[in-house]
Amino acid sequence: MFKKLFTSESVTEGHPDKMCDQISDAILDAILEKDPAARVACETSVSTGLVLVAGEITTKCYVDIPKIVRKTIEEIGYTRAKYGFDSDTCAVLTAINEQSADIALGVDEALESKKGEHRDELEAIGAGDQGIMFGFACNETPELMPLPISLAHKLAKRLSDVRKDGTIGYLRPDGKTQVTVEYDGDKPVRVDTIVISTQHGPEVDAATIEKDMIEHVVQKIVPAELLDENTRYFINPTGRFVIGGPQGDAGLTGRKIIVDTYGGYARHGGGAFSGKDATKVDRSAAYAARYVAKNIVAAGLADKCEIELAYAIGVSRPISILVETFGTGKIAEADIAELIGKHFDLRPAAIIRDLGLRNPGYRNVAAYGHFGRADLDLTWERTDKAELLRKEAGL
């Protein structure tokens, strides 16, 4: 078998783009708590001393957006000006409008309903936009995710944990991780390279940071059997990372879509998740596609599975569904597609119902990945249809 390297990255909750994702989803959660049927498209931008929240929100409730923004930033850890951002003193600007009436026409009543072709009430709601969404699963890890992104997320989360619990007191919120895994054919065999860039106080030297990162972060997360004497470590390779967060780089909602999904291991339709309610198929259909792919792999129908869904704005049924098993399928892809059509309802209203997507809780996935989260009970991560699929496939 041939050897190859694959690399994925993650970022901590203090990364400027991830700050924006969390703020947008915290606002979404607060609105859904009071008005589950609200339409939300909330975008956030941050720069030095400034937060701008803009978008389209149609709701019957009131939420205090500046208060939510400040609380989210405080929980992330930007509480002092010397960290590069202060939740108490930053400016918060809002520019919120209602959802376009033209878009609402298609979401409120789907094309099938307008033509009198709808079979049930689930076809009364149309997709909130056109677009393509991908879902993926593979058997490289227990959570059925690619190993590079799984390790990158866990390292990033560990960076945050050791900062917040005081294990490494000089750390600050901003940070990034990157993991390169060596494959023998399609099997991951070792970790080739680990990159960690972490914001820190000015008082600490590079040697101390490297020692602490390897001892308290890498060795606590990466299985020892994946590390060897040839594994390379790049810890803060610029030599200094004191200026970070929005002071170092401006941030924007939806700019970490590969981090949010599969780390580049699978395709991506281009749509971001955070700040969007579930009528936006960018989010809900991507979650549904992961749910389908994960159940297919959990059922043993394939070692790898990628699902593509496509929608037209204002139309409830998917325009197309594609199954790709990369030669690992135990049954034909056409047969898998038939099972999907039989056991998964991929109309937006059905996805929202089956996955409980009107419930708040989106901020929990706004950092460290929307998929493969063993630390959270996510409906789209359940494998409750795997046994049924296995039986019907005759495996």
Curated annotation (Swiss-Prot):
Residues the entry annotates as binding K(+): 43
Cofactor needs: Mg(2+); K(+)
A GO term from the CC aspect: cytoplasm
Gene Ontology biological-process annotations: one-carbon metabolic process; S-adenosylmethionine biosynthetic process
Binding site for L-methionine: 56, 99, 249, 280
One Pfam assignment: S-AdoMet_synt_N
Protein name as annotated: S-adenosylmethionine synthase
Annotated organism of origin: Alkaliphilus oremlandii (strain OhILAs) (Clostridium oremlandii (strain OhILAs))
